Amino acid sequence: MTLFLDSSALLSVAIEGRGRQVVIDALENDAQWCASALALSEALALVPRLTDEQVLQDDVEDAVRLLWDRIHIVPVDQMCLDRAAMIAREQPVHINDAIHLAAADRLPRPWQFITFDPAQIPVALSMGYDVISS
C-alpha cells in the first residue's frame, strides 16, 4: 500500500508530539511514501513558528528534508490545480488543503492519507480516503 503525507504529517516526523509516533508507525508499515510537491514548502514555512532557537529550527528542517528525500513527489500541475479548485468549491477547505487532497486523488488506490489537519480529516473521509491521524 502507499502512504500519502500532507505537510502536517511531514512536519510531525521532526517534532516531539503524539503525531510523531503515528507517522513513524505508518512509515514503517508502508513501503511507498508520497506527498504533493507543495508539502515541503508548506512544512518548511512552519518551522520558525515552532521555535525561536535557530539550532532547533535547523534540526527540524534537516529531519524534514531527510524524509523528503525518500518520498515520491506528486506534481502540482494544472490538472492537480483544477481538481483542487473543484474540491475547494465543494468542500469546506482552503485551497492549499485542497491541493493535497487533489494530489492524493491522482494516485492509484489503495493508499492511506495521513494528516493532522482538522480541516482536512472530515473532507478526506467524505471523499472515501483511508485517513490516518491521531
Q: Model regions: which residues?
A:
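Short, well-structured N-terminal submotif of metal-dependent ribonuclease cores
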Residues: 1-38, 50-62
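Residues that scaffold the ATP/ADP-binding catalytic core of kinase and kinase-like folds
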Residues: 13-14, 46, 123-124
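Phosphate- and divalent-cation-binding pockets in alpha/beta enzyme and binding domains
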Residues: 22, 42, 83, 122-123
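Short glycine-enriched loop/turn motifs at secondary-structure junctions
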Residues: 26-28, 66-69, 106-108
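Short, structured coil segments at secondary-structure junctions
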Residues: 29, 127-128
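Active-site-proximal, substrate-binding regions of enzyme catalytic domains
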Residues: 40-72, 83-85
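Active-site neighborhoods of divalent-metal-dependent phosphate/nucleic-acid chemistry enzymes
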Residues: 71-122, 129
